[in-house]
Amino acid sequence: MLTVSLLTLSLAAYASAVATVTDANNFMDAVLHTRIPALITSEPILFPFATIPPFNFTVAGTNILTNRELQVNVSRGEIRGFSTEVKRVGDCMPPVLREGKTSIRCTLNFTGINATFDTHTRGDNIVASDKNIWVRASVIDTTGQFEAVAERGKQGNVHTFLVDKIHVKVKNDKALSLNDKRKKKFRQHFEDKVLTVLPQIFYGAYLHLLGAAVSSVPFPHV
């Protein structure tokens, strides 16, 4: 009877020491929602926003009677949401032991990160009016893969951080009068700019902060 009781206690102690899905979820949430927001305030590349340098482009006119070549001057772009919009999708995978290290894998969602642009245009109509308008580009339907690993008794580190194909939706001020063809080309320039800059940020400054955040949160081991 004593042997059975000791065995039961041993199994209970073992079970309580094994990390669960809940532990993995709590770890990921602490990294994303507690540590990243705290660390990001000391990262000038990301706080209070990431900056997109000025750029210019033109959109050809389509009808000499109604519009001219559209000249676009973007004086500033600001990307926000790195501290608030990155979230896990559902549950993380149960922590497992891989090559002597505990591994935590989660799918992340980047929807909601957005860029706003200070934009000056000329030529959307036949009189070539000068207009100061807003443009907003939002990340939609974009996920990524994350894995952190740690040896027992040591800090965790980022093993995998991969952002899947980034999707962006662009909207602009209704004060800008463009037909569908010109509107598509106009918005494409902003989409292309965001798709160029975001990966540089994700795999640069953000990944650096992610690593610091992971190493500062107690790691749940199996």
From Swiss-Prot:
One of its GO terms (cellular component) is extracellular region. The keyword Aminoacyl-tRNA synthetase does not apply. Glycans are attached at N56, N73, N109, N114. It is found in: Secreted. Keywords: Blood coagulation cascade inhibiting toxin, Glycoprotein, Hemostasis impairing toxin, Secreted, Signal, Toxin. Induction: Up-regulated following blood feeding. Its main location: secreted. Salivary gland (at protein level). Adult midgut. GO terms for molecular function: toxin activity. Residues 1-17 form the signal peptide. Inhibits host coagulation by delaying thrombin generation and reducing endogenous thrombin potential (ETP). This is Salivary anticoagulant protein P23. It comes from Ixodes scapularis.
